[in-house]
Design a protein with these regions (language model features):
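Conserved residues in the N-terminal Rossmann fold of short-chain dehydrogenase/reductase
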Residues: 62
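Proteins that catalyze or organize thiol-disulfide redox chemistry
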Residues: 1-57, 66-70, 74-82, 86-114
Length: 114
């Protein structure tokens, strides 16, 4: 999937640097998605638009789950899409399934400094 100015594509190789270490400075919302998953095709554009709207308030890290099964297993994902917010190297909250922009905005606002 294409990455915008506030979103990146991440894999098992660069996860530690681009998610865990980077979240020490800026929260990172990880979007675990899969090509075969219709709800993923609904949620990812919502997350990309919000990443642009928040203009650096968080980084969106997109991870294709089928290609990165070790990461999906590490976080015990049970379905897709699943979004996990990392702050200071730790997962602080998550949600699963396609969600409306207002739901995701409220989720983010609970954890981000405004």
């Amino acid at each position: 999937m294409a990455a915008g100015p506030y979103s990146i594509d991440v894999n098992e190789t660069d996860f530690t640097e681009r998610v865990l270490a980077a979240s020490a400075h800026t929260p990172v919302l990880v979007d675990f998605w899969a090509d075969w998953c219709p709800p993923c095709r609904v949620l990812t554009p919502v997350l990309e638009r919000l990443a642009d709207e928040y203009a650096g308030g968080f980084v969106l890290a997109k991870i294709e789950a089928d290609e990165n099964m070790k990461l999906a297993g590490r976080y015990k994902l049970r379905g897709f899409p699943t979004a996990i917010l990392f702050v200071k190297g730790e997962p602080v909250d998550q949600f699963s399934g396609a969600r409306a922009p207002d739901y995701v905005r409220e989720f983010l606002d609970r954890h981000l400094d405004k």
